[in-house]
């Protein structure tokens, strides 16, 4: 089977793992996400994951409490580690091999990030999960996804969202909104489209890393993407 993308970096939010809940992890949603990963692995696609931590902690929760921004960001990074560990175990429960690489040193819990080591493991079939963002405050997990995607020589960054691409307007508010099949990086920046943060977009643009925005819960969407079919919105 011919695949357009052999190595992908999949980014999704921590909130996506809550299911219908308001906090934490939903077991059915976790397994649903990992089934998409398994579908990719069954095709032979090498997979790296970046997950947010908003289902466990968000900085806005502590604004005004006297906690510094840098401390809040570090707390958010730790939340992504919790999600990464959960994903690793579910991935392995489904018969795959997986390793958590954290940008923050957590001895006995995760591995430190080394691009060459990661790429070797992925080539051998391991699903690489990148936790703790970039390891530095003031950077989002979107930026971490862009950075890790570039570092591991991914063919594309797949940005999973609640909608099936980028639209001309908010489809939840405007019934005439149309999905845009393709955009350039500069289109997104000039129009200030709020799907991925600008730092991440500029990083991808400067390193010619394509981004595909898609609905992570649309059945087989990620499979269609790696086969080169029209799905979501391509930014390149």
Curated annotation (Swiss-Prot):
GO MF: ATP binding; UMP kinase activity
Catalysed reactions, as listed in the record: UMP + ATP = UDP + ADP
Subcellular location, record wording: Cytoplasm
Enzyme class label: transferase
InterPro entries according to UniProt: AceGlu_kinase-like_sf, Asp/Glu/Uridylate_kinase, Uridylate_kinase, Uridylate_kinase_bac
E.C. code: 2.7.4.22
Keywords: ATP-binding, Cytoplasm, Kinase, Nucleotide-binding, Pyrimidine biosynthesis, Transferase
Chain sites annotated for binding UMP: 53, 73, 134-141
Modulation of this protein's activity: Inhibited by UTP.
Chief location: cytoplasm
GO CC list: cytosol
Pathway(s) annotated for this protein in UniProt: Pyrimidine metabolism; CTP biosynthesis via de novo pathway; UDP from UMP (UMPK route): step 1/1
Gene Ontology BP annotations: 'de novo' CTP biosynthetic process; UDP biosynthetic process
Domain of life: Bacteria
UniProt KW Protein transport keyword: no
Binding-site residues, ATP: 11-14, 54, 58, 161, 167, 170
PANTHER family: URIDYLATE KINASE (PTHR42833), URIDYLATE KINASE PUMPKIN, CHLOROPLASTIC (PTHR42833:SF4)
Family to which the UniProt record says this protein belongs: Belongs to the UMP kinase family.
Function: Catalyzes the reversible phosphorylation of UMP to UDP.
Quaternary structure and interacting proteins, as annotated: Homohexamer.
Protein name: Uridylate kinase
Organism this protein belongs to: Hydrogenovibrio crunogenus (strain DSM 25203 / XCL-2)
Organism phylogeny: Bacteria, Pseudomonadati, Pseudomonadota, Gammaproteobacteria, Thiotrichales
Gene for this chain: pyrH
């Amino acid at each position: 089977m011919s695949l357009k993308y052999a190595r992908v970096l999949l980014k999704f939010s921590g909130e996506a793992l809550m299911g219908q809940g308001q906090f934490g992890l939903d077991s059915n949603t976790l397994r649903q996400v990992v089934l998409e990963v398994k579908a990719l692995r069954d095709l032979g696609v090498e997979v790296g994951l970046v997950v947010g931590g908003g289902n466990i902690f968000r900085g806005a929760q502590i604004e005004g409490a006297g906690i510094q921004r840098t401390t809040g960001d570090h707390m958010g990074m730790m939340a992504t580690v919790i999600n990464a560990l959960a994903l690793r175990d579910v991935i392995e429960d489904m018969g795959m091999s997986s390793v958590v690489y954290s940008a923050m040193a957590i001895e006995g819990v995760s591995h430190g990030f080394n691009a060459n080591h990661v790429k070797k493991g992925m080539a051998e079939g391991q699903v690489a999960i990148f936790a703790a963002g970039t390891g530095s405050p003031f950077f989002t997990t979107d930026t971490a996804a862009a950075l890790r995607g570039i570092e591991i020589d991914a063919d594309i960054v797949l940005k999973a969202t609640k909608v099936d691409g980028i639209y001309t307007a908010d489809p939840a508010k405007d019934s005439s909104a149309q999905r845009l099949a393709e955009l350039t990086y500069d289109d997104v920046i000039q129009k200030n489209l709020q799907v991925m943060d600008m730092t991440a977009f500029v990083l991808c643009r400067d390193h010619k890393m394509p981004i595909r925005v898609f609905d992570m819960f649309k059945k087989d969407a990620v499979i269609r993407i790696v086969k080169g079919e029209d799905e979501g919105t391509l930014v390149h």
